[in-house]
């Protein structure tokens, strides 16, 4: 779950910037699908966790894999992603060549976006 100060506002940003689809909405807790993966947003309320702006640093690193990481990051940057924004570049990894870049969303969460997941080898074919 990503801690955010205002779950409805964050859900709107993720929808507009990352193409998120809302799965369900309880007000302060919202379920989304981003790049085919379920993501939960929640507003902390003095229960032992907090969002990055109050912590003063990122509290999570989100990894997303998609067909076009350049476009995914481009949409995020155009919608206001700032901070640790790095363009997509090629990485030589044990599972093969992998293109990856990153950005920080307006809520302080660090996102890494790549084109090839090392976990893909474990996913059964459809």
Q: What is each stretch, according to the model?
A:
Residues 1, 11-104, 114-126:
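Vicinal oxygen chelate
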Residues 2-6:
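Short, surface-exposed ligand-recognition loops at beta-strand->loop->(often short) alpha-helix junctions
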């Amino acid at each position: 779950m990503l801690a955010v100060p205002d779950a409805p506002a964050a859900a709107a940003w993720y929808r507009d910037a990352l193409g998120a689809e809302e799965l369900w909405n309880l007000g302060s807790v919202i379920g989304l699908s981003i790049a085919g993966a379920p993501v939960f947003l929640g507003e902390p309320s003095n229960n032992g966790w907090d969002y990055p702006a109050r912590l003063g640093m990122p509290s999570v690193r989100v990894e997303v894999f998609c067909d076009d990481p350049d476009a995914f990051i481009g949409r995020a940057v155009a919608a206001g992603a700032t901070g640790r924004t790095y363009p997509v570049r090629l990485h030589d990894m044990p599972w093969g060549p992998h293109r990856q870049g990153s950005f920080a969303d307006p809520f302080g969460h660090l996102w890494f976006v790549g084109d090839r997941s090392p976990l893909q080898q474990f996913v059964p074919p459809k």
